[in-house]
């Protein structure tokens, strides 16, 4: 994948990621006399005996380089022994956040390895695709459940309002869910079949409810459009039927 990144200076520590700054066990500074030789836009690494580094990690002046099968230092996004790494234009291995041109992100740990799967940074969760090490955005299905990540790849919790005005709800683990949800003092009901909030007159678990144009459950009196009829919805949202005493007055509600 050839994607030129924008390197961020964002300083965030990943939970479950190593936080040390010591050298990786796989990268050991070479104690022999060494020489970094420029070749085109890359480099070769020559040992004192005249041989060159091939398929090898080398540390020079504190910077880490990887020399491929052709003996040239690699640059850009590279997969080495199944792990993604990133090297700048000078072929130096990078750590920390990288934002790609398509808006996704990768995080390279202290040893340069890209993190994958679920990761948390300062309390914000991200999911990095195990096959690409790039963060997910928008609606994605993970482990059989829909999740939503915003434009910055951050996992979303709570109510999301879509462009068409419909709403979905994501629980504390970021999973789309259904059922009753209270938010900012209002009650909503999310259909389990599609995860969307319901509106208007709805029968739920054997009781009738009414949800307004903003998907919020209605309580109190409701006058129906186009007819001279009223209904009453208790504080729990359930519609009144039959003979009821409300506010000291007797009312009779038909079965419709």
Each PLM stretch: what is its role?
Residues 1-256:
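Extracellular adhesion/carbohydrate-binding repeat motifs centered on closely spaced tryptophans
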């Amino acid at each position: 994948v050839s994607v030129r990144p924008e390197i961020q200076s964002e300083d965030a520590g990943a939970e479950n990621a190593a936080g040390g700054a010591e050298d990786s066990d796989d990268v050991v500074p070479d104690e022999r006399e060494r020489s970094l030789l420029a070749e085109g836009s890359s480099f070769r690494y020559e040992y004192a005996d005249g041989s060159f580094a091939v398929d090898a990690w080398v540390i020079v002046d504190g910077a880490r380089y990887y020399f491929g099968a052709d003996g040239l230092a690699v640059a850009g996004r590279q997969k080495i022994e199944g792990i993604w790494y990133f090297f700048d234009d000078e072929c130096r291995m990078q750590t920390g956040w990288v934002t790609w041109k398509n808006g996704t992100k990768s995080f390279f740990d202290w040893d340069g390895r890209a993190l994958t799967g679920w990761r948390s940074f300062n309390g914000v969760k991200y999911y990095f695709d195990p096959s690409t090490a790039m963060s997910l955005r928008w609606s994605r299905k993970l482990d059989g459940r829909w999740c939503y990540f915003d434009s910055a790849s951050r996992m979303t919790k709570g109510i999301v309002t879509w462009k068409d005005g419909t709403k979905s709800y994501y629980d504390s683990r970021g999973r789309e869910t259904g059922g009753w949800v209270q938010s900012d003092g209002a009650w909503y009901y999310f259909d389990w079949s599609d995860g969307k909030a319901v509106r208007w007159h709805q029968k739920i678990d054997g009781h009738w409810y009414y949800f307004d144009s903003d998907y919020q459950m209605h309580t109190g009196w409701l006058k129906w459009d186009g007819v001279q009829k009223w209904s009453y919805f208790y504080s729990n949202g359930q519609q009144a039927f039959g003979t009821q005493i409300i506010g000291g007055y007797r009312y009779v509600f038909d079965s419709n």
